[in-house]
């Protein structure tokens, strides 16, 4: 079945919200890149961090502005204190999709991100979180806080992508300083969010729009993000294998019932290259996988292919005996997370967005850092 993509009449339906220090740094990085078609907001308990941010839309969580002291409970209470302000920001923007990015394990990101997500969910906004877990050299207490925060956050988002910081170091060919390690983590948060938002806001030969992304990510639970790059004769195989291997995440494509595939390539790429790459990826997913794909040409790419994949719709084991604490006791209980169980199909079902006159996308060269990590694996 083929769906035709609606014309993009409002490119600013996406808001990226950075919560806490790491989330704010990722959003600052995206802002400085001049990304179009996306609104940005930073939320923090630290007034100094907000003052340093170039982002125009800022929300101080709580009344003191002195930070959360690495205590998620302080971050949670500060966010609850600012519920109305955050809600008003969402309502005024007309946002249909919110990305929440944060580093889990500290005070503000861990405690406040679930509150912000709950506000977005209650407003009927498609809510996706992209968060990091601490490095191994950080305290065990911080990892425990991160795990608890992730479980709480998962209750209030449609899709959750978790990036373990430790995975970032596995592909490096030299030791990194602590400053370099955290800068790399911030860049990966930015890359994860931007790779998804680009699918909607960038123009391509076969476009993907908000409805396409919503089909894959709404009510999906844990999701998987992978980016692969290939060049030369075996570019399709190289790019697809990089996506399948995906060293950056703890999840994988295996068992996914929903796939969103976006391919950026040079104009001389053969249709068979696209077919081969797509088949390699879908073969690793569930037998009844539903997939949507888009393509874009980039004129300065020479015999190259870049593939971005979002995989979702995994079978997850749930434990109803442990209920996470409500992030906002003053608020009504959040609706139960929808089951990510698409109806089985006899074979993979492909949904395409409509062609858009061969318009070329904006330059995605800022993703090359992650390609270098992937290529080293």
Regions inferred by a protein language model and the residue ranges of each:
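Tubulin/FtsZ superfamily GTPase core signature
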Residues: 1-377
């Amino acid at each position: 079945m083929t769906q035709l993509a609606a014309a993009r009449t409002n490119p600013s339906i996406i808001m990226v919200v950075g919560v806490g220090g790491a989330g704010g740094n990722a959003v600052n990085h995206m802002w400085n890149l001049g990304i179009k078609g996306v609104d940005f907001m930073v939320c923090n308990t630290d007034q100094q961090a907000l003052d340093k941010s170039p982002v125009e839309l800022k929300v101080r969580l709580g009344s003191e502005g002195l930070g959360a002291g690495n205590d998620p409970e302080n971050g949670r209470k500060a966010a609850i204190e600012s519920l109305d302000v955050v809600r008003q920001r969402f309502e005024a923007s007309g946002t249909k999709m919110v990305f929440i990015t944060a580093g889990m394990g500290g005070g503000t990101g861990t405690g406040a991100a679930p509150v912000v997500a709950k506000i977005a969910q209650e407003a009927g906004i498609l809510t996706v979180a992209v968060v990091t877990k601490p490095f191994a050299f950080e305290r065990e207490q911080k990892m425990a806080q991160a795990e608890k925060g992730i479980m709480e956050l998962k209750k209030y988002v449609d899709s959750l992508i978790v990036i373990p910081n430790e995975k970032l170091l596995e592909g490096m060919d030299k030791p990194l300083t602590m400053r370099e390690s955290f800068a790399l983590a911030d860049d990966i948060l930015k890359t994860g969010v931007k790779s998804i938002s680009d699918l909607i806001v960038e123009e391509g030969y076969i476009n993907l729009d908000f409805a396409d992304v919503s089909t894959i990510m709404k009510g999906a639970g844990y999701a998987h993000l992978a980016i692969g790059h290939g060049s030369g004769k075996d570019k399709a195989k190289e790019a697809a294998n990089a996506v399948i291997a995906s060293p950056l995440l703890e999840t994988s494509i295996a068992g996914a019932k929903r796939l969103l595939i976006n391919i950026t390539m040079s104009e001389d790429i053969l249709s068979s290259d696209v077919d081969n790459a797509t088949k390699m990826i879908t073969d690793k997913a569930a037998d009844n996988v539903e997939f949507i794909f888009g393509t874009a040409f980039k004129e300065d790419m020479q015999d190259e292919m870049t593939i971005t994949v979002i995989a979702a719709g995994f079978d997850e084991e749930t434990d109803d005996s442990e209920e996470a604490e409500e992030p906002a006791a003053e608020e009504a209980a959040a609706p139960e997370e929808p089951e990510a169980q698409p109806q089985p199909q006899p074979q993979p079902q492909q949904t395409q967005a409509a062609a858009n006159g061969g318009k070329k996308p904006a330059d995605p060269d800022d993703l090359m850092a992650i390609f270098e990590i992937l290529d080293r694996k």
